[in-house]
Amino acid sequence: MKTKREDVRNIAIIAHVDHGKTTLVDELLKQSGVFRENQEIAERVMDSNDIERERGITILSKNTAVTYNGVKINIIDTPGHADFGGEVERVLKMVNGVILVVDAFEGAMPQTKFVLRKAMELKLPVIVCINKIDRPEARAEEVIDEVLELLIDLGASDEQLDCPFVYASAKNGVAALEISDEMKDMKPLFETILDYIPAPEGDPEAPTQVLISTIDYNEYVGRIGVGKVDNGTIAVNQDMVVVNHHDPDKQKKVKISKLYEFDGLQKVEVKEASIGAIVAISGISDISIGDTLCSPENPTPIPFQKISEPTISMDFVVNDSPFAGQEGKYVTSRHLRDRLMRELNTDVSLRVEDTENMDAFKVSGRGELHLSVLIENMRREGYEFAVSKAEVLYHKDENGKLLEPMEIAYIDVPDEYTGVVIDKLSQRKGELQTMGAANGGYTRLEFRIPSRGLIGYRGDFLTDTKGNGIMNTAFDGYAPYKGDIQYRKQGSLIAYETGESVTYGLYSAQERGTLFIGAGEKVYSGMVIGENAKTDDIEVNVCKTKHLTNTRSSSADDALRLTPPTVLSLEQAIDFIDTDELLEVTPESLRIRKKILDPKMRKRVNR
């Protein structure tokens, strides 16, 4: 018989990048007594990965739990970025409600639509938390209207529209149910969660069912499956069967060796867990997302949302440049392969395939951000390799027509730059869907555009809007191929010989275009050292020194003034490279190079 488990609540937190959801979770942890009084706490405890802290985004969904008035509240932090949408869909299967965190000034942002739509489809109740209410320019009343409009647009039911609003300042650790109320602590939010979010239900007497929604990985115990106990109970040393909804023939007998529940930020070992509990299970070597752990007597898999397919791919290649092996710790194809295969343990939206070339692997993901985060992680771990230009993954329909992935781009841009943004995106086959005024002299544009039209556009976008534009994208299915797009209009400046760059050589090269290197940097023949102002590639000798004669002194070189070079970030470099180029990634450097380094060979191929 189905019963409710009143001492547990499972909730997910949804928010736009930077609206303060991770800070909110920190405060809930602090005020429920997870930390000791004198304990030093890192800001944004939940963003535990270095890149997450630097970029201020959440990439992996994380689990934590707080106890309030004897009720255990399991909180799951969801990624706000559409590139990591594969995470979101599965996480929502574990919870009974969501908290939508909205900035009191910026209002409901388009990126939240993606996650919120998934929550609406699953009929989950919503608590709206208007955060940053202490901002001087906060406009809470208007934001409430915006949120309700957004919910109506997403087809919310009457129950979902009748949602409670909580006003908070997560930074100060206070919340209230009315703007005029005095704010003391986070109690109003805790109370609202207990009152409004339903308790998980299930049948404790039925055969056990646990759907694995996320995978954690630990060097010591290997793969750890995380999921919610839907029915029955699960205990250590219990015999179970692993089955999968999309692959019903796959059945495997396993034994539960260790079982954990979440408490604060820790995993705590438990002997058994009942319905509604979110548990972590170790000891099953090849457990994967979407598997259901069942009792052997009646194994029935739980249906789950298929993981979104990748839309974009890059080749990861062993570095074969003249400087190969000088800066990295792991440089061989075996190292590269092992590391990519290890990434598959935790990242389910990723695909890795072998290619005809033994030294290259085709890696597919949900977007440029998804892959650039992987590249940056590998680089920090000491790997050295090269990557090719990102390409989209095409499909064919039943008539053999070519289909390509489409995206919806939501853009907020200052009014004076609207024209140039519309012009550039139209050239990239984007279609303007809606256009309207946003607050603060901004215009909000919505484009439907092929994914390949966005490759390499972010750099242009920031330049065109003087850094003031905001662009968010979300995958929007496949559509017929829209025709060819012309990418980079400029050619490359290519180093003519291997050596060290000299002021004299750079001075004559900078008249040709924009340089990416300064004086005293090592270069090799075939390396791209700048962007040509014209459309063709041109070789320049940046290692050329001035011939000394008895009438000229070498000190006259000091008078040559170089324009400071443009140093490309990883994203900008990925955007910049062309189809005949590679980006060499090492722990210390990013270098762009031609695939074929020998100039004579290059000319022959280009004929």
Where are these regions (language model features)?
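Charge-rich, low-aromatic oligomerization/scaffolding segments with amphipathic character
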Residues: 139, 291-294, 368-384, 421-422, ...
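A short, contiguous, amphipathic alpha-helix enriched in charged residues
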Residues: 321-344, 559, 563
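Conserved nucleotide-binding/hydrolysis micro-motifs of P-loop NTPases
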Residues: 19, 31, 81-82, 105-108, ...
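Interdomain boundary/hinge elements
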Residues: 41-44, 154-168, 200-211, 240, ...
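Canonical P-loop GTPase G-domain recognition
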Residues: 125, 135-195
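Conserved nucleotide-binding/hydrolysis modules and their immediate coupling elements
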Residues: 209-314, 324-326, 490, 499-549, ...
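P-loop NTPase switch module centered on the Walker A-proximal segment
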Residues: 1-102, 106, 146, 215-218
